[in-house]
Swiss-Prot record:
GO terms for molecular function: histidinol-phosphate transaminase activity; pyridoxal phosphate binding. SUPFAM superfamilies: PLP-dependent transferases. Belongs to the class-II pyridoxal-phosphate-dependent aminotransferase family. Histidinol-phosphate aminotransferase subfamily. Its EC number is 2.6.1.9. It is an enzyme of class 2 (transferase). One of its GO terms (biological process) is L-histidine biosynthetic process. Pfam families: Aminotran_1_2. Keywords: Amino-acid biosynthesis, Aminotransferase, Histidine biosynthesis, Pyridoxal phosphate, Transferase. It catalyses: L-histidinol phosphate + 2-oxoglutarate = 3-(imidazol-4-yl)-2-oxopropyl phosphate + L-glutamate. This is Histidinol-phosphate aminotransferase. Homodimer. Its cofactor is pyridoxal 5'-phosphate. The modification N6-(pyridoxal phosphate)lysine is found at K220.
Amino acid sequence: MNADIDDVLALVRPDLQAFAGYSSARSAAVQGEVWLNANESAWANPADAAGNSRRYPEPQPLALREGLAALYGVTPPQLLIGRGSDEAIDLLVRALCVPGRDGVLVTPPVFGMYAVCARLQGAALIEVPLVDTEDGLRADLDAVIDTAKSRNAKLVFLCAPSNPAGSDIALDEIERVATALRGQALVVVDEAYVEYAQRPSAATLLAAHANLAVLRTLSKAHALAAARIGSLIAAPELIAVLRRCQAPYPVPTPCAELAVQALQPAGLARTAERVATVIAERERLFAALPGLPGVRRVYRSAGNYLLVRFADAQAAFDTLLAAGVVVRDQRAAPQLGDALRISIGSPEENDRVLAALSARRAAA
């Protein structure tokens, strides 16, 4: 084991570094024909026509793990599957942060689960706000590095592309943060929307930076939000520790089977087509929205959404809702008291957004 890996494993809570976790019946590497080791029913439920649900699922379904590893360009030992990215975020905070001692650094306004998990664990929440610039709401990475060092951050979450701001972080900048915080913090890059950013994943940096981890999901570009398939990509040694901290059966069999089918070539080709459509539609709305009544600013985005400031965000929200269009009200988020986040839908759905907001001019 090299020194970099030693440094990363030293970030794990001391009381969990030798933690064995729970050994489930399915985790035992045994073969047989009559399975009487897990107290399961010998008969399928009448509602289970295929008869596949009476057995517990694989803790980490092999076919899915291999398919995801191939998709993300990593090896299966580098990958942990969980119930969406949320579970991976929670696992990281619980496994690394000692309550009352360690901190979790975030860059608000940003995805709220980082803060939720930190507070549930009793970890200090350290905030380095995004900076509103001509190029958008962007992470101040110098401040991130300095604050992480001075405030004892154990985890640094970089949402790239950022939700809801839409700004991205270049790989060389991510690498700079990981290098600066080597030995002190795990830098976690949340790439839930990276398919829309048209850049390589930060997973390409893992070989050189053991204190880097990457979150991926099938919920967005791959259109499997209900299946709750998220992945954490990191050093195999860290993945092994987190696996011991994870619940025994995190991935239901029907969800795993659906995801495996989605990762076949035909499914991936269709996903790529739809991502291209979303990117084109995002640029169409980015160009059209600034000319509509009440729109103050539209932020350029690398995700499948646009952050929009309005002269009267409540009125804009109500106008869209009256037209049957539901968007995300961001006014409770820091710096976003006048903003809504609009997901990029189908061309027809996006036309309804533009028509509803344009109608405000006619009404005026």
